[in-house]
């Protein structure tokens, strides 16, 4: 049983590591990263170390990266697991908060790619306007009167169609 467990764990580890390396490169627009089993030769007892080298920086463990670099690296790892074993839904709670606009753009492009390739639905909690603009549908909670919350939903694809239909160019055509 342990032999089978070790074999499956190593196989999954190698697949996740391969995806992680590729996704890190895409999310950072360069650099390199890998996963390492540490503290034991037995994969069932080993720890995991995340090593990363964002563009222009030396290879170091996750804890030594900046907050934004940590968030993007962790996102690459999460997405690597999803590519290895896709789930139908994933909730991401403000993972874009420490990211600058260029990284938010790459993050959103990666979400779209994963949705298209795995079929996973991502529920993204965010305050970042750029992330909201790249989503298909937005849900918001408002408080019209004290103590009474209401849910607002906007389908951005339909909203774009309405704007295009009402544009002056469309009226002249």
From Swiss-Prot:
Which SUPFAM superfamilies does the record associate with it?
Answer: P-loop containing nucleoside triphosphate hydrolases
* InterPro entries recorded: P-loop_NTPase (IPR027417), RecF/RecN/SMC_N (IPR003395)
Protein name as annotated: Uncharacterized protein in ATPase CF(0) subunits 3'region
Species source reads: Rhodospirillum rubrum
């Amino acid at each position: 049983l342990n032999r089978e467990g070790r074999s499956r764990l190593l196989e999954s580890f190698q697949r996740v590591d391969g995806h992680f390396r590729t996704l890190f490169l895409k999310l950072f627009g360069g650099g390199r990263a890998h996963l390492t089993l540490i503290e034991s030769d037995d994969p069932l007892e080993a720890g995991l170390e995340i090593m990363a080298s964002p563009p222009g920086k030396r290879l170091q463990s996750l804890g030594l990266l900046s907050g934004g670099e940590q968030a993007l690296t962790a996102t690459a790892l999460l997405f690597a697991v999803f590519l290895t074993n896709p789930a139908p839904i994933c909730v991401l709670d403000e993972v874009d908060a420490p990211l600058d606009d260029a990284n938010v753009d790459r993050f959103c492009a990666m979400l779209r790619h994963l949705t298209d390739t795995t079929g996973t639905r991502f529920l993204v909690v965010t305050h970042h306007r750029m992330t909201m603009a790249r989503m298909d549908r937005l849900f918001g909670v408002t408080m019209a009167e004290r103590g009474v919350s209401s849910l607002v939903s906007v389908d951005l694809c339909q909203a774009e169609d309405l704007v295009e239909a009402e544009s002056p160019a469309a009226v002249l055509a």
